Amino acid sequence: MSRLFGTDGVRGLANGLLTAELAMQLAQAAAVVLGHERSTNGARPRAVVARDPRASGEFISAAVSAGLSSSGIDVYDAGVLPTPAAAYLVADLHADFGVMISASHNPAPDNGIKFFAKGGQKLPDEVEDAIEAQMAKDPVRPTGSDVGRIQTFSDAEDRYIVHLLGTLPHRLDGLKVVLDCAHGAASGCSPQLFNDAGAEIVVIGAEPDGLNINDGVGSTHLGALQRAVVEHGADLGIAHDGDADRCLAIDHEGNEVDGDQIMAILALALKESGKLKDNVLVATVMSNLGLKIALRNAGISIRETAVGDRYVLEEMRDGGYNLGGEQSGHVIFADHATTGDGLLTGLQLAAQVALTGKSLKELATVMTKLPQLMINVKKVDKARAGTDEGVLAAVAEASAELGETGRVLLRPSGTEALVRVMVEAADMPTAERICKHLAAVVEERLAVAPAV
């Protein structure tokens, strides 16, 4: 049987893989695994439950709350909130764990369930495995006064906004900011946050109807935000995804500022203020080489991880670092959050525009993005990508040609029979030439023999 938990919780088509029955079973199992510590002390454990505004989130949330309360867990129902808000509230409430119901940037028919441990931390693999194992056992069924209660967490959003405002290094008075909330979980609190921080705001993508989340808006569809920033003469635009754990930005001319550029701006700002732990940024292997070059010149080193914010988080925890993230816009401020937080990231970025008096476009020039090209080579034996002599020789030859002006990365897909070939170079023609050559070598050398 395949593992139920993926890289970011349990995710799938609502009422397909992810049924109310499965949601309740997951909740009942999590109640045993995550609520065990306090239940042994005689007190009922507590859990925070939140969701994004997908229509299916209502029945999944109800099933989760039923599964938890019937297992002796007191539920604090926070309603529609960003994923990072749920993580923060677990810590703020001193709850035993939290549950977030969201499929992030996926389309509306999908949904997901992810858990946060005490303190708002993501679960390690072994705890997820323990929850799966518990699902095969009978749930606990307390009675009488031991049954959990469900209550509305009425000030959840206010607590989160007050927390974020407390991180501001400079107010946003005088700035005009366009917010794209992806018709998602940030639709209520992001406009409130930026308004309270002093910005003049224009809001798009903040009319969720349960079916329009991420539909033509948000961090995966930047066109609407780019147009709005230019049309309104705004200083910058901030784009969230459906659950608001990531942030991309738009400068006043309508140019995209991606996660690498955002991390460069914020890393330099933290270093200048003496707050960047060990002068280290944690980023994945997919971050642009231009980021590493710019930060190296500024006396900041990069610790590289595999792709995925969970690996960034692990490296940050292990090394005690306080800033990390991904090109996609997951940025983690360990001093203020336990996970990627798109509202916190956007707030800190806007604060740098206000604090320095420089435009976002000017701030983004701290790094020069190298042209980057990626080709997916399908129907190949991805397991041999790191051992085939012909492939390794071609990669070594390309790397030698690029020297310090570029790099080559081969990444076998975790879910498909393909290998991703990525090349960065000083110019796009060079990147294209080398990438196409390597893709051809991979296709030839790793070809899967046709079935007889």
UniProtKB/Swiss-Prot annotation:
Record's keyword annotation contains Magnesium: yes
GO annotation, biological process: carbohydrate metabolic process; peptidoglycan biosynthetic process; UDP-N-acetylglucosamine biosynthetic process
Superkingdom of the source species: Bacteria
Record flagged with keyword rRNA-binding: no
InterPro entries (alphabetical): A-D-PHexomutase_a/b/a-I, A-D-PHexomutase_a/b/a-I/II/III, A-D-PHexomutase_a/b/a-II, A-D-PHexomutase_a/b/a-III, A-D-PHexomutase_C, A-D-PHexomutase_C_sf, A-D-PHexomutase_CS, Alpha-D-phosphohexomutase_SF
Cofactor binding note: Binds 1 Mg(2+) ion per subunit.
Name the record gives this protein: Phosphoglucosamine mutase
Species whose genome carries this gene: Arthrobacter sp. (strain FB24)
